[in-house]
Curated annotation (Swiss-Prot):
Protein's organism: Magnetospirillum gryphiswaldense (strain DSM 6361 / JCM 21280 / NBRC 15271 / MSR-1)
Protein's recorded name: Magnetosome protein MamR
Protein family per UniProt: Belongs to the magnetosome MamR family.
Pfam families assigned to the protein according to its UniProt record, in alphabetical order: HTH_17
Inactivation phenotype: Normal magnetic response, slightly smaller, sometime scattered magnetosomes. Deletion of approximately 80 kb of DNA, including this operon, leads to cells that are non-magnetic, lack internal membrane systems, grow poorly, have reduced mobility and take-up and accumulate iron poorly.
Domain of life: Bacteria
InterPro entries associated with the record: HTH_17 (IPR041657), SinI_DNA-bd (IPR010093)
Function: May play a role in controlling magnetite number and size. Coexpression of mamLQRBIEMO in a deletion of the 17 gene mamAB operon restores magnetosome vesicle formation but not magnetite biosynthesis.
Keyword Chloroplast: no
């Protein structure tokens, strides 16, 4: 039973990642305010290294939420940082 949920969850995650990739292709490098980005994606959008983004997150320069061992950054927070 639990394996069925894991497999279904995995399939859902694959679908979501595919949908997000499609949105990225359609909208290009535009930062979507309601999208949640990983620190790596944020770094790519900002044209910097991931470690730089993580330093700014830890310093409070860019607002983010820690999810497990990773940070997630709302697109509107990236826009806010860029407009400073």
């Amino acid at each position: 039973m639990i394996w069925t949920a894991v497999i279904k969850g995995s399939a859902l995650m694959t679908f979501v990642q595919g949908a997000m990739a499609l949105v990225d292709k359609v909208f290009g490098e535009e930062i979507l305010p309601h999208r949640i980005y990983s620190s790596g994606e944020a770094a790519q959008l900002l044209g910097m290294e991931r470690l730089q983004v993580l330093e700014m997150v830890r310093a409070g320069t860019i607002k983010a939420k820690k999810v497990g061992d990773n940070y997630r950054i709302l697109g509107s927070n990236l826009v806010e940082y860029m407009n400073r």
